């Protein structure tokens, strides 16, 4: 039985978000053994329990108050929200923040040999999908009537198998669609992973732990999106060098031993430093340019 004094977090047991969710928790300093097949794993250093479940169960667990937090794709969350509203429920939860992984898009796809002149081409057609409510909302807004074919997997084979005229499914590269004679024709929803919290009163100790976790998540994401940059640069061209690094804080400037015209620059940049940028820095006279990853970061 779950201990209600411990913070309960639901994550995907296996699948698209599983590895990234586990990595995020680990980088937040939560020591936990997630390599076993147990449904519930207890953190060693914090009062936190991790529930490993199917991704489409996570929104319901949060909305029903079974767990305190959940890491879930916005596509799954929105589908469950629409499903419950269609049944007359009023689901409650809070989205604490979007995360920096799990990006995908939900798209319409049709056979490659069929003409496409917009959603109206699907009027009266049968569409296979695992997201019937998101599909209905989109096509209702377009004034398109259709028949839904609900499939929980292998949606892309439906047209070839004669089950549907088109599909609505998650797309990453489009290779699976191409292999099944389909082409992506319209994106209806873009999604990333997000962290959600249940509605209702929360014990002060739990809320303090959630606040601490949010601060650490922010630090992890900032660290992943930032780089620590060091270089030697001509003193008279510092502003030109800084202008090439948008998003960077004002740099730390240090004198170089035996050098009057050059200084050492240290800075954190929130921008990806491409080879082209490094070549421009070098053209301005910068040298010994180092770009380093940041493990942890807190403003």
From Swiss-Prot:
Its cofactor is Mg(2+). It holds the Pfam family HisG_C. SUPFAM superfamilies: GlnB-like, Periplasmic binding protein-like II. This is ATP phosphoribosyltransferase. It is found in: Cytoplasm. Equilibrium between an active dimeric form, an inactive hexameric form and higher aggregates. Interconversion between the various forms is largely reversible and is influenced by the natural substrates and inhibitors of the enzyme. The keyword Ion transport does not apply. Its EC number is 2.4.2.17. It catalyses: 1-(5-phospho-beta-D-ribosyl)-ATP + diphosphate = 5-phospho-alpha-D-ribose 1-diphosphate + ATP. Its main location: cytoplasm. Feedback inhibited by histidine. CDD domains: PBP2_HisGL2 (cd13592). GO terms for cellular component: cytoplasm. Keywords: Amino-acid biosynthesis, ATP-binding, Cytoplasm, Glycosyltransferase, Histidine biosynthesis, Magnesium, Metal-binding, Nucleotide-binding, Transferase. Transmembrane segments: none annotated. One of its GO terms (molecular function) is ATP phosphoribosyltransferase activity. Catalyzes the condensation of ATP and 5-phosphoribose 1-diphosphate to form N'-(5'-phosphoribosyl)-ATP (PR-ATP). Has a crucial role in the pathway because the rate of histidine biosynthesis seems to be controlled primarily by regulation of HisG enzymatic activity. Pathway: Amino-acid biosynthesis; L-histidine biosynthesis; L-histidine from 5-phospho-alpha-D-ribose 1-diphosphate: step 1/9. It is an enzyme of class 2 (transferase). Belongs to the ATP phosphoribosyltransferase family. Long subfamily. It comes from Salmonella newport (strain SL254). One of its GO terms (biological process) is L-histidine biosynthetic process.
